[in-house]
Amino acid sequence: MSKAFQLIDRFSEDVDFAVISGDMSGNQVKMLLSKLMKEVTVGFAEDKSFADISKGSKYRKQAFSYDALVGLDVSVNPIPSRIIVEISAFANPFPYEKRTIEPFVTTYLKKQHLEDVASQYHLEPFELNVLSLKQTLCEKTVSLIRFSMSQDPLASLSSKIRHFCDLNALMTIKDLEEYVCGVEFVRDVETLVKHDQAAFDDPFGWKGLKDLTQSPLVLDFENLWEALTPRYEENLSAIAYREIPSSERVKVSFLKILDSLRTINLTKSSG
């Protein structure tokens, strides 16, 4: 959202890839994910201290460290000198569109009229297939619903606190705000929930969710958000390079999404 669409003004330490596996066998997918992880992390050293590692047959998540030339302590630079790479064959990466990606360093060099330096270090803009904004909105919404079904919704939602900020940014686009209020959004969320219920076993109550109003996020959002607000303000302020949206503004945006979510009945839609 920051690099392809310039919608959010914050740094990120993770890179997410979705693999379109088609008719590939399970073993072929596993080998492809392993090969991709090696190719996109050439020159980096794996961070063995990273605990949330996964090397499954359809999902890989690893952290890689790099040399930080600017020696800032954690109080000044809270973003660790590492990149978290996630490659998934679980995802449903449709629809997508081709977007031009320009590194932050390249943007700076252009402003300084140093395009030759960008070329020297192979920092020219490049194209990538990027998930559409509608699908991004649905995926972040469903992710929050799924994580809210854990035994400790507050802790789980805290780990996904940036999704709330991202959803607020998406809701500033008039077409997306209108999309959320329509039947297309309801249908797309229903489809994605069913897809993710088939793909993910955790948390415990996720697969048995039949009505989104059973989700603590939908059922008790205002109280949850009040408890999450300090985490939102602390976490986002640390990685943003412009002022972050107020917690009240983020709350109002998500309430609009909730209005549509409350109309979804998974049992009815599957019958």
Task: Give, region by region, the residue ranges found by the protein language model.
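Beta-strand-loop-alpha-helix segment that lines the small-molecule cofactor/substrate pocket
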Residues: F17
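Structured mid-to-C-terminal alpha-helical surface segments
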Residues: K3-D9, I20-G271
